[in-house]
Structure formats: C-alpha cells, structure tokens
Amino acid sequence: MKVAFLKDVPGRGKTGDVKEVNDGYARNYLIPNKLAMPASASVTSEIAAKQAAEDRRKAKAEAEMAQLAKELDGTNVSIKAKTGAKDKLYGQVTTTVIAAEIEKQTGKAIDKRKLELSEPIRQLGSYEVVIRFNKDLSSKINLIITAEENT
C-alpha cells in the first residue's frame, strides 16, 4: 500500500514522503496513529503545497538572519560593570548580560545561546564576541567592558 507520511517514522519515512509499505503495517499502525494516510492525488498535492510553504518560510527566516548578521557585524557594544582591585570584575559578564545589552543598544533581540565567548569575561577591556546564527552564518561584535563610576 502506498502511504503519505504525515510525521517522521524512524526507519520508514520522513514527513511528506510517499512510500510503499506493507498493507498490515499501514492499516494497523500508521493510519490509526495518524502517522500516515493512504496516498492519493489530493493528499500528495496537499503535502507538496505544505512543503512549498515550509520552504518559503525557511527561506524568509534565512534572509532575515542574514540581514541581522550584516547589521550587527562590527557593532560596538559597551557594558559598565562593577570592579574591584586591578580592574577585576565582581563576578563575570555572562552571555545573558551581553544579549540584554545588545538588545538595549541596537534594538535587535539575540538569543543568549547564539553568543560564543572565547574565554570568560572577568576583567575590563575589549573583547570580540561571535554571534553564530547557524553553522554557515555568523557575525562578530566588539564588546567593551568599562568600570562603573562610583558616585
């Protein structure tokens, strides 16, 4: 029996695939569990339309990410932090703080998990932070840590 997979089934097929499976497997497992439905012209065209819409959505998201990476590349972000002796920070500057400061200064929301630090930031100075949007797309920002003025 030919079925169109509605969900991924390990070892059998992925969402959108149209494959031949045993009749009993299709009738007793795939169709009752709504993992697949019998393949017909209308079902395959519906799946193709959903796949095309998903591809357009992914392409749009990819273009937006590329634009954001281009806008943020080379941006200077400054953070004021409390310091102790020898310009050593109390605690450290985390990716959460950096992401919040990027959003505050540029208006662009960045997920903290996309930020990559080469080392923990525990002293004043200038650091390069990589924002990895996906495996092929990244940008670098310059992070400047300055001492908070005591009043």
From Swiss-Prot:
Function, in words: Binds to the 23S rRNA.
Biological process, per Gene Ontology: translation
InterPro entries: Ribosomal_bL9 (IPR000244), Ribosomal_bL9/RNase_H1_N (IPR009027), Ribosomal_bL9_bac/chp (IPR020594), Ribosomal_bL9_C (IPR020069), Ribosomal_bL9_C_sf (IPR036791), Ribosomal_bL9_N (IPR020070), Ribosomal_bL9_N_sf (IPR036935)
Keyword check for Chloroplast: no
Family membership: Belongs to the bacterial ribosomal protein bL9 family.
GO MF term list: rRNA binding; structural constituent of ribosome
Pfam families assigned to the protein according to its UniProt record, in alphabetical order: Ribosomal_L9_C, Ribosomal_L9_N
GO cellular component terms given for this protein: ribonucleoprotein complex; ribosome
Source organism (scientific name): Dehalococcoides mccartyi (strain ATCC BAA-2266 / KCTC 15142 / 195) (Dehalococcoides ethenogenes (strain 195))
UniProtKB keywords: Ribonucleoprotein, Ribosomal protein, RNA-binding, rRNA-binding
The name this protein goes by in its record: Large ribosomal subunit protein bL9
PANTHER family documented for this protein: 50S RIBOSOMAL PROTEIN L9
